[in-house]
């Protein structure tokens, strides 16, 4: 054990990390627990696409804290780090790096193989940087054997999983309308779009379509005019009422428009802005059912020759029923283009309508006069065309939310394409029931998860990209039959090409392989790659190379992952193993700035974890993030709260330094025999630290990390530093081998060692540093090789409750002193306490005297002047009009007598029964008394001062100033000094006491090394001008 100085947490971090690296501590801990019970954790993989942000840091700190806790419990923790390395997050970054504008550029300017190489290089480079950032936070994970979806073994597990899906008839290829990114030129799944809706300003267009066999018009509303050239149907709700609106124009002409009756006024109000309408009226109202089957003339028939062909098909350009039609806006008639919307697609399929989606992968039209035009660039032209044909009812703008690409942030299109799907709809009910068995933290996430899953459709797993796990599906060019390959060995066996290197099965190498179909035709691989969420969904079993289900005992990610990663891994495990892949799942919130705004470059409010740790050290950030609020709530990052956390850890360090330095001075060697001599305050702190340990373990098991850290903070600040250290400070000045001193040292040693064991999961660097200084030769070499135990025999609930009362009393005395401006250095002659706590005060009154600086404690009812105040609210309920008579009866009895009578229950006066709740007794307190209420009654403090009180207070004033001067001179604790005091005359007893407290000798003359002059003002307004000289005792 060595003496301890002040701490710099950043430097401490570096020192401890160097120690761990030198001693290979992480691996030693794993080896130590190798035969312990297994604890399986799956790391939700961050994308290797840049530096970590504060949210990523929070996520890893949560994980590291839980896993460190499990290690010190003796568990063999399976803790592979994970990385997301495929997909659009990487591709988009590489495209930007090489100024690539399209998929075509990838193939023509750089080449597929080079692009794949660059994506791999980019991912690996960022992996290394991010790993360093995580290690800087003190994170212990198995980075050496981290799972990487770009490795062949992992990719093979993706193939094996897809083959299992195929064998269970859960894999299908289908033409469906879904999300399409025109910039990335690929389809996207619905879970990739959740949370990616942004507010946009789009056209708001009302259009009239002429009915084929009459001069009447149906009206529709759309925010995507570019889809009108592809219109195939119009939907109505059969149950709604539709009005035939006679519209008269200023030029004397008239038309009939069909609009849902409830929306007529809203639509006509808009129509009047763009048309010279003189008046309108409803001629008749019919049910939507009567409109079904009516045919209309496509509004852009001449502009799109393809529509002229479709018009010849029986059900095309017809009004059909649709349950999705509402009266929340629009006209009550819905424009339907089956190629550009899920509802549209399903309606079209139901009525055998051709799926017409005339746009290419870049989002440009392939038919009509708008051929070659990007769809959003068509809007104004389409509107102008409608105006020229007198078919526009109204045109404006509307703000609404619209889906964007989750990586490049481009507005998405709804487009019908052929894709590969996992048929989740077939197993959704099982997934929901399995999800209900998970231990969700907090428990309300279960409802959110189940509700989210209930709305998911089949999973679109195919992506028209390059950097990903290639779909292991080969399709025959002759008969269209397809086969799913489940492993590299199977592919080698089936391949026509025997010399292809399959050490890497990414594109384009795997694309070169052909198979032979049973019909004799050539089979080529479908060019698509798998959704990157499929990659991470494989993690529970692919990360450990297992084809058997091993449920994770703990996973945690941010709240955006509830229906993303939590779902994707469950879905794949359900497909393969018919079960969920995890037992306990915790959701955490997002990190925001101090005002609650999302952090972003544009707002300039991003907080870098590297910057924070450089300023504060990793442990301060770790403790702050886990204690700022409940983990599942969004966290508003605050530098002032970081300062408070650092201050709290500094308080712990100072308490440790105080303890260690005195122990070193006295050559203290820990020995459990000293526990035989503990005092009440020692027994209490031994009980408290084990109670806190018990609470901490319970909180970490849940895990409720806020409960864990709040319990630690409260113990450090209130129990240990502000209470126990103060109680035993005088014992550290006793003779070297005094049993009271030794028992205090033994208690301090035990409490600090127990405390850092509990804190080690959240403050690993600080805990390790203290442990290394305090550990004895027979202890494990690292705190993380030392098992966390709870000594229940030390826990004494009665003692803790009694001490809580004593602390309340002391706090009340301090409040009373503040009220009276009576500082703690001046003793109080007497306090009066209620008799109901006599037993507790008789046992521990000495603590009240020491900590409150009180000379005498009196246990009795305070004898002040008692007055009675009737409780008119209660009296009114019972006596109503008789209240004045009851009040008179109460006032007829002396207050002291009434109080005594009511102590034994109800009391009858003038035929009225008086109950205790009918009155309130107040005590008038004399000027020399201050009363303070606490949970058991009141503390009454006598604030009268006499000469003895003043002298004792001045002694403390002088001691405090000499100690302050010692600190200024940077003197060691045991360094003796000579002191010369002028301005106050003390008796020899008082001088002797001061000399003992400050380790000094009072002398008449000295060669001063340091002089300070002070003015002391006592509570009774006396003033003393003093001068203190100190000379080092050489």
Curated annotation (Swiss-Prot):
The gene is ileS. InterPro entries: aa-tRNA-synth_I_CS, aa-tRNA-synth_Ia, Anticodon_Ile_ABEc, Ile-tRNA-ligase, Ile-tRNA-ligase_type2, M/V/L/I-tRNA-synth_anticd-bd, Rossmann-like_a/b/a_fold, tRNAsynth_Ia_anticodon-bd. The keyword Cytoplasm applies. It comes from Methanococcus maripaludis (strain DSM 14266 / JCM 13030 / NBRC 101832 / S2 / LL). Monomer. This is Isoleucine--tRNA ligase. GO terms for biological process: isoleucyl-tRNA aminoacylation. GO terms for molecular function: aminoacyl-tRNA deacylase activity; ATP binding; isoleucine-tRNA ligase activity; tRNA binding; zinc ion binding. GO terms for cellular component: cytoplasm. The lineage of its organism: Archaea, Methanobacteriati, Methanobacteriota, Methanomada group, Methanococci.
